[in-house]
């Protein structure tokens, strides 16, 4: 038996951070029901690499082990389907733009009417309460605004994005942990909760001591290539006769 068996998640997410979160929950045994828009579906269905049959390998990997339905949530019939599902699941996970489910009449207050102890988990770029809450964001925007790009690369070149979508993946893992903790707490207290994980907050938490260094010294950590900007030597990549070595 896998550790999350018995937990059911209604997954409204698309692209990467949310599906990656739900994928991890499904891998550990949660039943994940993925909800997509009719006709278009998840935008990552159109992301490469593609399999020989023309389907997106990207979508297949990050949405493995999930069940799927397509619902038009703008129609009354679609809203009723979603409300019935609210009554049968433990967790709702979404990464819509701020306020989208509320505008559809399917927000947290509606969830609690049919399932008072539900866990409602929201991933956004900038959270549910701040001045940027209505802004949308992709990984590169968050890497830039968090200072991650300013720290990455060589000093003689412009700031550099990570080779992988680290803001998305870190956020997905952070939310997965938050959901597991909320489920554990619900077993003790019988109460659900609302979870708010912002990509920007997550990246601030992952840039190690950059924020701390600025708070203590007023100095910004600059780009140092592959060297460690601390008193650790040797810590770099070095070109040797046959290739690089770290």
Placement of each model-derived feature along the sequence:
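N-terminal helix-loop segment corresponding to the beta1-alpha1 unit
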Residues: 1-191
């Amino acid at each position: 038996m896998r550790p999350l068996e018995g937990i059911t998640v209604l997954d409204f997410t698309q692209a990467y951070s949310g599906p990656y979160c739900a994928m991890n929950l499904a891998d550990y045994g949660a039943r994940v029901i993925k909800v997509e828009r009719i006709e278009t579906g998840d935008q990552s269905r159109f992301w490469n690499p593609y399999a020989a049959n023309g389907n997106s390998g990207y979508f297949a990997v990050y949405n493995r082990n999930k069940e799927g339905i397509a619902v038009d949530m703008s129609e009354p019939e679609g809203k009723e389907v979603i409300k019935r599902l609210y009554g049968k699941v433990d967790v709702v996970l979404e990464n819509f733009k701020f306020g989208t489910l509320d505008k559809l009449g399917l927000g947290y207050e509606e969830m609690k009417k049919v399932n008072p102890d539900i866990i409602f988990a929201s991933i956004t770029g900038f959270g549910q309460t701040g001045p940027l809450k209505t802004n949308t964001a992709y990984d590169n925007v968050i890497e830039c605004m968090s200072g991650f790009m300013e720290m990455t690369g060589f000093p003689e070149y412009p700031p550099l994005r990570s080779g992988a979508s680290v803001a998305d993946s870190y956020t997905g893992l952070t939310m997965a942990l938050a959901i597991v903790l909320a489920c554990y707490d619900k077993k003790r207290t019988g109460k659900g909760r609302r979870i708010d994980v912002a990509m920007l907050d997550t990246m601030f938490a992952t840039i190690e001591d950059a924020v701390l260094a600025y708070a203590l010294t007023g100095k910004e950590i600059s780009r140092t290539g592959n060297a460690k900007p601390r008193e650790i030597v040797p810590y770099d990549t070095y070109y040797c006769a046959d290739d690089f070595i770290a």
